[in-house]
Amino acid sequence: MSPLLPSFPPAVLALADGSIFPGYSIGAPGETTGEVVFNTALTGYQEIITDPSYSRQIVTLTYPHIGNVGVNAQDAESDRIHAAGLVVKDLPKRVSSFRSEGALDDYLTKAGVLGIAGIDTRKLTRILRDKGAQSGAIVAGKVGDSYETLVSKALELAKAFPGMSGLDLAKVVTTQKVYEWREAEWNLHGADGKPAYGTLDTGKPINKVVAYDFGVKRNILRMLTERGCQLTVVPAQTTAAEVLAMNPDGVFFSNGPGDPGPCDYAIAAAKEIIEKGVPTFGICLGHQIMGLAAGAKTLKMKFGHHGANHPVKDLDTGRVAITSQNHGFAVDANTLPDNIRVTHVSLFDGSLQGLAWKDKPELCFQGHPEASPGPHDIAYLFDRFVELMNAASKKEGE
């Protein structure tokens, strides 16, 4: 028998291995497919589902109560929900937050995104941990629909999804036009005494930075702006020649979804920009792009890193930082060229987390120093990028 609640439409999550999870719909009706992953963050569900890096992924949140504080426009990391679907244990119907502008289920429904609640997320997470991330599908029906019909359709869809390997999604989620960004970090006590985002402080030294948008999160742009970066955001397929013609002090390669391997346009651009010696910083997919541009290889991880409690060791200082992570691919440390050194490693599995070039002003990091959600222990990497740009400018002036 299905444990569906009579007042909610029925929904089913199916995995490619045949696992079935009946529950109830908390979003739009219909069907969706994607790679099913789990995220261990306790907070930040709105930031997670609006992160473009989750494109074509069905996100399982391991924390049991999701939706407590509702949603609001300020916490979105992009202009829409990018996750293919959302899986939670329990959706509280009472929202409690002075910042809330609506409920999570309404947010999903208006965006046309499927969600399922009422399932055993602990069991699901253990399957994904032991067997690895899997193709999956959510099918959400109407009140009174047959549970058996939903199951057969969900299984069919789950087994048909090809997985994330080989998918170039950066050019799918990227901006379609060049734009300027001037919004800085959130301040509980803004200019008028009310919570608000800051703006670029033109009274301080400014660095002109071109940011490649492979699926960039807004909080990354805010943290760069907070540090005096005057940002020009460009589409993923912008050539190195176009970027270099802007005469930037630095170049940033953003986070993003999918497999870095097929992004040959980005790899070629990164290689040319790095060879020119322009200070460059990459995060997440941008980190992988820079690694590939240097001649290293990437690999698909078993279930990836998705959460806000991942310990990472800085090999230069010995310091351990708790970081936010969201990636299913990683740079293979065994394939690095001699001119690159490893700067950070994961204390969960020893995987490569950070790189620096020995002969050029370049660095990159696999995790998310901007967090959102998560800790800011590793935010000093933004400062290092600014230091690289300042040092390069000083050298040019000598």
From Swiss-Prot:
Associated pathway: Amino-acid biosynthesis; L-arginine biosynthesis; carbamoyl phosphate from bicarbonate: step 1/1; Pyrimidine metabolism; UMP biosynthesis via de novo pathway; (S)-dihydroorotate from bicarbonate: step 1/3
Entry-linked PROSITE patterns: GATASE_TYPE_1
Entry keyword set: Amino-acid biosynthesis, Arginine biosynthesis, ATP-binding, Glutamine amidotransferase, Ligase, Nucleotide-binding, Pyrimidine biosynthesis
EC number: 6.3.5.5
SMART domains: CPSase_sm_chain
Catalytic reaction annotation: hydrogencarbonate + L-glutamine + 2 ATP + H2O = carbamoyl phosphate + L-glutamate + 2 ADP + phosphate + 2 H(+)
UniProt-annotated stretches for the region CPSase: 1-204
Domain Glutamine amidotransferase type-1: 208-395
Domain of life per record: Bacteria
GO terms, molecular function: ATP binding; carbamoyl-phosphate synthase (glutamine-hydrolyzing) activity; glutaminase activity
The keyword Amino-acid biosynthesis belongs to this UniProt entry's keyword annotation: yes
Function: Small subunit of the glutamine-dependent carbamoyl phosphate synthetase (CPSase). CPSase catalyzes the formation of carbamoyl phosphate from the ammonia moiety of glutamine, carbonate, and phosphate donated by ATP, constituting the first step of 2 biosynthetic pathways, one leading to arginine and/or urea and the other to pyrimidine nucleotides. The small subunit (glutamine amidotransferase) binds and cleaves glutamine to supply the large subunit with the substrate ammonia.
Family indicated by similarity: Belongs to the CarA family.
Name of the molecule in the record: Carbamoyl phosphate synthase small chain
Originating organism: Polynucleobacter necessarius subsp. necessarius (strain STIR1)
Origin organism lineage: Bacteria, Pseudomonadati, Pseudomonadota, Betaproteobacteria, Burkholderiales
